[in-house]
Swiss-Prot record:
UniProt keyword Lyase present: yes
Enzyme class at the top of the EC tree: lyase
UniProt source species: Rickettsia typhi (strain ATCC VR-144 / Wilmington)
Molecular function in Gene Ontology: fumarate hydratase activity
Residues that coordinate or bind substrate: 98-100, 129-132, 139-141, 187, 319, 324-326
Coiled coil ranges: none
Gene label: fumC
Site (Important for catalytic activity): E331
Ranges where the record places region Disordered: 121-140
PANTHER family membership: ASPARTATEAMMONIA/ARGININOSUCCINATE/ADENYLOSUCCINATE LYASE (PTHR11444), FUMARATE HYDRATASE, MITOCHONDRIAL (PTHR11444:SF1)
Pathway: Carbohydrate metabolism; tricarboxylic acid cycle; (S)-malate from fumarate: step 1/1
InterPro entries xrefs: Fum_hydII (IPR005677), Fumarase/histidase_N (IPR024083), Fumarase_C_C (IPR018951), Fumarate_lyase_CS (IPR020557), Fumarate_lyase_fam (IPR000362), Fumarate_lyase_N (IPR022761), L-Aspartase-like (IPR008948)
The name this protein goes by in its record: Fumarate hydratase class II
């Protein structure tokens, strides 16, 4: 049989199962928003706990929290950060657009843990009050966007950047010995002039290098924190200097260069920094989609495709075709890319709906951004482990396709002119003969002259 205790808020009393630490406002949110099962991301809860810890420290230093209260709050938060109370943050994304209920969930749980330590009984509002003490000098309107920024930075630094660096390392490692492998290039999915396999992969490498640069550029605005703006940006009920000191505390705790936002009205009413950052994630997914699809095409076959790359064989590919193996890691990564692109559309629409002094699409913005970061990080790591590491060139196939390509004729342009070179290509294609044979047949070049000019190794700069 479940045991219950009574908690209260401005709406009155409400029953809460005794084993949980949350209070009345959290319970009301649970009762009122039974919408799907997408909970607030764990890293956002972690960021909100960091926020409360730093706020309590600043309030104590400003003389606004007595030592016993501040210490009990600090200890409670340390336990939350250590993962002791993960089941006490049950609220879904689909709640108030300011994130107020999740902010109060954190306030109530911290106060409840602290009160249990001080009195032996969880819950209640004394001696530690969720609003008067844990939320002191704060509003959900500045706390939740601050947590959004902290969570985005932490997730990016801990997950996405390492994953992209891992991909970059293995692309560089794989291609370093491919500078002597000359293959045919393709534009419009049609044969083009030659290049080396290393040159082809250098494009992918640069895309990932640029992706990492874009992340650092986009994070510059995400480092700016809204805390101190309180309700509408004026800083009501927050002391002068609280915002600066708070940002310094967060920077010290996280070892990230957080600063207070110069204009709190902007940081409450708009989320342009996160829309921009989501745009960076979108661009990264565009890059990854291109890279993955190229590898898929180059590995197509095994007998009737391009077949220039051997892709690792990880599992059976068909329930009806025996022996079939598919590029499943590519497929997983490209599906993730489409999801991230869709997430960016959501973030864009949500970001554009910051009406007057407060954007009230905050939970859906951060949910989609954090999902994009997680999906990209996990899928890139999987792609590296189960695909990129095992890529091998099919030298025989590469050479065969290169040597019968009609576009080697391009190098003849300076010697016999574009129109005559085009005639050679068309003649070779029409009669199924080599370029050399066509050049001789049309009396443009002898075999010896052709061999001196058409050298793939000299066509790659």
């Amino acid at each position: 049989m479940k045991n219950y205790r009574i908690e209260s808020d401005s709406f009155g009393e409400i029953q809460i199962e005794e084993k949980f630490y949350w209070g009345a406002q959290t319970q009301r949110s649970l009762n009122n928003f039974k919408i799907s099962k997408q909970k607030m991301p764990k890293i956002l809860i972690h960021a909100l706990a960091i926020l409360k810890k730093c706020a309590a420290q600043v309030n104590y230093e400003f003389g606004d929290l007595e030592y016993k209260i501040a210490t009990s709050i600090d200890k409670a938060i340390d336990r939350i950060l250590a993962g002791e109370f993960e089941d006490n943050f049950p609220l879904v994304v689909w709640q108030t657009g300011s994130g107020t209920q999740t902010n109060m969930n954190m306030n109530e749980v911290i106060a409840s843990i602290a009160n249990e330590e001080l009195t032996g009984k969880k819950g209640g509002k004394s001696p530690v009050h969720p609003n008067d003490h844990v939320n002191k000098g704060q509003s959900s309107n500045d706390s939740f966007p601050t947590a959004m920024h902290i969570a985005t930075v932490l997730a990016t630094k801990q997950q996405l950047i390492p994953a992209l660096n891992n991909l970059l390392t293995y692309l560089q490692d794989k291609s370093k010995d491919w500078d002597k492998i000359i293959k045919i290039g393709r534009t419009h999915l049609q044969d083009a002039t030659p290049l080396t396999l290393k040159q082809e992969f250098s494009g992918y490498i640069t895309q990932i290098e640029y992706a990492l640069e874009r992340i650092e550029d986009a994070l510059k605005k995400v480092y700016l924190l809204a805390q101190g703006g309180t309700a509408v940006g004026t800083g009501i009920n927050s002391k002068i200097g609280f915002d600066i000191k708070f940002a310094e505390k967060v920077a010290e705790f996280t070892q990230q260069p957080f600063k207070t936002a110069p204009n709190k009205f902007e940081s409450l009413a708009a989320h342009d920094a996160l829309v921009e950052f989501s745009g960076t994630l979108n661009t990264i997914s565009v890059s990854l989609m291109k890279i993955a699809n190229d590898i898929r095409l180059l590995g197509s076959g095994p007998r009737c495709g391009l077949g220039e790359l051997h892709l690792p064989e990880n599992e059976p590919g068909s329930s009806i075709m025996p022996g079939k193996v598919n590029p499943t890691q590519v497929e997983a990564l490209t599906m993730v890319c489409t999801q991230v692109m869709g997430n960016h559309v959501t973030v864009t629409i949500a970001g554009s709906n910051g009406h007057l002094e407060l954007n009230v699409f905050k939970p859906v913005i951060i949910y989609n951004i954090l999902q994009s970061i997680e999906l990209l990080s996990d899928s890139v790591n999987s792609f590296v482990t189960h695909c990129v590491k095992g890529l091998e060139p099919n030298i025989e196939r590469i050479n065969a396709l290169r040597d019968k390509s009609l576009m080697l004729v391009t190098v003849l342009n300076p010697h016999i002119g574009y129109d005559n070179a085009a005639k050679i290509a068309k003649e070779a294609y029409k009669y199924g003969i080599t370029l050399k044979e066509a050049a001789k047949k049309l009396n443009f070049l002898s075999e010896e002259e052709f061999d001196k000019i058409v050298i793939p190794e000299k066509m790659i700069s």
